[in-house]
Amino acid sequence: MTDSANPTPSARPPRQPRTGTTGTGARKAGSKSGRSRAREFALQALYQHLVGGNDATAIDVFTRDLSGFHKADAAHYDALLHGCITTAQYMDELIAPQLDRKMSEISPIEHAVMWIGVYEFQHCQDVPWRVVINECIELAKEFGGTDGHKYVNGVLNGLAPQLRATEVAADKAAARG
């Protein structure tokens, strides 16, 4: 038996916490970019739209009054909120073939996160496709169900070659060497 005050030499050192993250691995609020914050507020607004059927203008007014909105990239938030609501049916048609269940069975959080991912794939060409997926995974980890981030990852990885074909192909070619 080993003494806890004198561990054996082979004992592993205590795990060091990742700085700038929460217990779930999500980034802490202080280390988030304006665009990351915009995605969070857009997610909350899109959730209101999906669950309550609220009008985009009413949601927008409510969301802009939330604490911390001033730190978000307002232009990116506007693009996500209004763009996702305007193109929701089209985005659902893109997402549906990637699903293993009916859209109505998808959590509204994961649904909204997938909308954000699809919208950014199509309209935010300055954001690399892997960053889009990573940001959406982080949103799903922070706000979604236990394994929702895995589902979001699978769906967006399935859509990336379709929506960002050139960029994905170039990344895969570079990885092969």
UniProtKB/Swiss-Prot annotation:
Gene: nusB
Keyword field: RNA-binding, Transcription, Transcription antitermination, Transcription regulation
One Pfam entry name: NusB
Highest taxon in the source lineage: Bacteria
Compositional bias of kind Low complexity: 17-28
Family: Belongs to the NusB family.
The protein, known as: Transcription antitermination protein NusB
GO molecular function, one term: RNA binding
Function: Involved in transcription antitermination. Required for transcription of ribosomal RNA (rRNA) genes. Binds specifically to the boxA antiterminator sequence of the ribosomal RNA (rrn) operons.
Gene Ontology CC terms: cytosol
